[in-house]
Amino acid sequence: MCAVTVVPDPTCCGTLSFKVPKDAKKGKHLGTFDIRQAIMDYGGLHSQEWCAKGIVNPTFTVRMHAPRNAFAGLSIACTFDDYKRIDLPALGNECPPSEMFELPTKVFMLKDADVHEWQFNYGELTGHGLCNWANVATQPTLYFFVASTNQVTMAADWQCIVTMHVDMGPVIDRFELNPTMTWPIQLGDTFAIDRYYEAKEIKLDGSTSMLSISYNFGGPVKHSKKHAISYSRAVMSRNLGWSGTISGSVKSVSSLFCTASFVIFPWECEAPPTLRQVLWGPHQIMHGDGQFEIAIKTRLHSAATTEEGFGRLGILPLSGPIAPDAHVGSYEFIVHINTWRPDSQVHPPMFSSSELYNWFTLTNLKPDANTGVVNFDIPGYIHDFASKDATVTLASNPLSWLVAATGWHYGEVDLCISWSRSKQAQAQEGSVSITTNYRDWGAYWQGQARIYDLRRTEAEIPIFLGSYAGATPSGALGKQNYVRISIVNAKDIVALRVCLRPKSIKFWGRSATLF
């Protein structure tokens, strides 16, 4: 009796097919996979189980079926976006790798396998369970795109198939899972940077120029089309500097026709080192693909988190590249920095953890022409505040970056409000009313209500950040609590500043904001 070789795969929960151009160019958007919709459309056991449980914490396995080809010199990436942070039209309907790499991503090299896999736990990336109904805050989506231009043009466009597989896991009894980060930020023995860098190239001209990746791992960064702040950059920007060891991997994305070897090393200066300087220090010689672990080496044993020029991961060509006469492409490779392991060096925070963090400043207030009063409503979530009744200047700091780089937040803060006036105190008239509210203003669902003389110039009031779902995104989710600031005789206000004093805040989800 013959063994059964063709069996159904009970883990499959959805499929996607897309065409790859024969001359695929870096940044080409190939396909979009809506995870929730795909499971519902595919139907079957998983859809029924999901409906029965309501909310789950599944483990997904993405399988990209692309025939192994060592000659194409092509890589395809898959980026996961749970919070609708990728706006393809705003990116020119392309997927520029540097911007996409700010979000959780896996890069597949065609030379490596016939079936390329990426397994991830949904809750670990997002911080919450997967609900079986659509909502305004989340839309788990995979974007497939060309990560590096293929070096050899194929005979024709070709089809690629993606299958999604799932283990729904046990039923869970809450939406929010363990927070991804809490404030004040505390790092453990290791921190997952999990960041790919756009393909580097060693040209076929005998050049031995040094390549590098800057150690400024924190704060917003400018890419080809957008600025970006990712989760790892937000977390690392908490401190002025960092030191320790980074580990990662290097993968060749070149055609098999082209090979080379190079050395990876820590370097501080702008000028490239001699080979002797490299070999005297910590280094790792790479022959194609491989893992690396490199300790930072700078004059002061530390690198500035948000500044260029205080350290870099150097890459120096050694041997090659070697390629046939007809080959025109460079030797290309992609660096992935996976983990940072801090050492015992002490680094101060950018700002004190108990200090105030400026949220926004209002100038050019526009009071009502008849009453002279202007109102500002500040909701119970941190976001890019806007108002038609004033000029708004948003502040930028590690707290605002962490909000932008995650999906949900929850906690308690003090709103610290201060203002400057145009008149001397003895001549100043007017007042500032500050109230905590819920629902529409006319319903008068109020908590605290205080009136301050305009001459006082400052006030504080606590507010909870959250929603009916517990945590809140950076946007309205149903009716939310809010603070209303009402200013009588507002024409005398030169500027009004709103700061946050964090008491305890939790954050969920590894993401990024492109702006």
Swiss-Prot record:
Cellular-component GO terms for this entry: viral capsid
Propiece span(s): 1-2
Transmembrane regions: none
GO molecular function list: structural molecule activity
Keywords per UniProt: Capsid protein, Virion
Organism domain of life: Viruses
InterPro entries from the UniProt entry: Nepo_coat (IPR005054), Nepo_coat_C (IPR005305), Nepo_coat_N (IPR005306), Viral_coat (IPR029053)
SUPFAM superfamilies associated with the record: Positive stranded ssRNA viruses
Intracellular or extracellular location(s): Virion
Complex and partners: The virus coat is formed of 60 copies of the coat protein.
This protein's name: Capsid protein
